[in-house]
Amino acid sequence: MARERDALYAAGCVLYWAEGAKSRNSLKVTNADAEVLVYFARFLRTHFDVPDEKMRVNCNLFADHLERQRTIEDYWLHRLELPRTCLRKTIVNTYSKYSQKKRQNLLPYGTTALVVNSTQIVQTIYGSIQEYGGFDRPEWLD
């Protein structure tokens, strides 16, 4: 079945294989590059008809982002074409008391996770990855 699909499907599966958090019932891809998450969202919308309200966005920011938290959240939501209702609690990491604060603004928009809870989609993607890769990983499948 997987080999009959288009390039978007194949790339979406490989993207999840490489960057996704492996779970039995939840898809989660985290990245600092908005294009990665935009592509993954398009894959989910196109091939699995995932509606916006089923997508969740989790931002992970750093202390130097605190003043721009709302702007950064809006950036991710805009890029992913999702309403604010999809945003979950943003985590802002604070500096330790030992930090010299030398590593500021390395990731201007922090990192963000795109999450969809669906056992059926996870299992379909796992099966496709195994078909593309030519291997069996029974622990992935129900």
Residue ranges and their predicted role:
Residues 1-142:
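Domain-length accessory/inserted modules outside core catalytic folds
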